[in-house]
Structure formats: C-alpha cells, structure tokens
C-alpha cells in the first residue's frame, strides 16, 4: 500500500503571506471631501466699533463738539447776564485702500477637486480683517493719512495701566487706578473689552481671599468672559500684539468707521503681475493664469468730543490699555 509523505522542504523557509505592502496598489484610499482649516476670523475692530454711513467720496467730514456753553448765576435783581458760546471742531475720516492679488495657473484650477476660489475668498477676507485690526489698534503699516492707533492714543493721554509680576490683576482692572477707572476719568463709560487670548487664562485663574475662582462658579460650565457687565472678545486673527497691550477697554461707540468701498472681488484673465521692484512676475495670458483681485476702501476716527468731566482733549481718551510691566 502506497503512503503519501509530506515534503518537509516546503517549510524550510519562513511562512509567506500577502501583506498590506504587497497589495497596496489594490487597496483604495478614502479621500476627505473637505479641507480641514481653522476658524475664519474677520475684523474684531469693525465688529466692535460703530459703523457710520458709507462714504460718498474719499473724505468724510465729521463735526465734533469742542467747546461747552457755560451758565452763570445772576447777581441780584438787576445783575447783568453773561454770554457764552459753544464750538465744534472738524474731524475727517479719510478712506484708504486695502488690496491683494491671488494668481493661480488655469491648469491647477481645472485639475483641482475643490472650488479653489471658494476656499480663497474667506481667507482673503480674514487677511483684510487682520490688516485693519493691526492698523487701527497698533499702527501696524497704517496709511500716513490715518490718525494714531488706539494704543498710541491711549498712551499719549496717559491712559495706561501696567501689570507687574506681583500685581493684583483684579485691582488693575476694577480698582480706582484700574483700566475701567481710567476711561471713566475721561467722562466715558466702558462698554467693551478687547484682549489678547492669553487673558482668558489670567481671568480663569483669578481667586478671592478664600481661594475660590472669581470668574468661574464650577469647572464644568463655560466661563462667561465679561468685566463689570461689559462683554469681552479675544481677536484670534493674529493682529493683537500682547507686547503692546494685554487688553483694551473703552467706549467702543467712540471708535467709528466708514466704508467707501466694501470688499469686492474681480477675476482677471489678462494682464501682468509685477514684483515690488517693477519686474514682471506673471503674464497671465502667456503663463495661462488667472488672478483674483480683492479691494476695499475705508477710514476711521475717534471723535472724542468734549465733556464736562474732562475738558482737556490732550488727556481725554475713551480707551485705556492694560500692558505688561517692563
């Protein structure tokens, strides 16, 4: 009787298997149908400030009360009545242009699986917001025709509170010499605060004498970020410079702006794009490219009219800043 014997030579080497690397070309890869990106943040200043009527020309003239009338007691029945006057100053909002050009090859547009322009436009709007906030708050690349920024204006009016390493943050905000009191000293009421995002942790960490958190009732609920009843916001478009100010508090109705031309987009298929030195970077027709141009024109001002509490306009400011001590 014939017996079948196993050939042990078949197992002289290690066992083989079809693994993932061998079949990689056969395994489909699932592609995301969305682009993962951060939250789009626009201008914090424009959302907090007061919008005036749109400009019909490059300049917007704004009358501002500059002198208050004075009343007098009359001495006796036949005493002479004195005269007084009231005066107005003129302030001008000058519209300046913000613009950017985004060139892209036509082949890239054709081959892309996404609507590239739909992805680009919100980010351009965010970039405009960063430029606006940086110029108005911190004088970053501001046009020469624009006034001093909010931080510079507050600094010149000596409306600055310095926070040292050992200082009590609560007192620096709420006490007599705090940022809120600085604004009130100029005859204004604080209606908002704009702060660097690092202030969130500073406020969460504030505790009373018994060690209880001041701004949080428990660790589960969300923290309500408001100071003395006024809301806070934390711009995260990259414009807020904590080296110049940790927080800006003030009457934001005194930060007014007017738009000459809201942001508009225009697509070009012909033309040239130049470098800053004048050399040609792209010839749209020759390079088979298109370019998206975004343009906006606006201006702003701080009216800061005279009031009965602070008549000296050099020391009167509707804003105060909290900054890190040197």
Question: Where do the language-model regions lie?
Answer:
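Assembly/oligomerization interface modules of large self-assembling protein complexes
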Residues: 14-100
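Short intrinsically disordered coil segments
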Residues: 76-81, 116-121, 208-210, 306-318
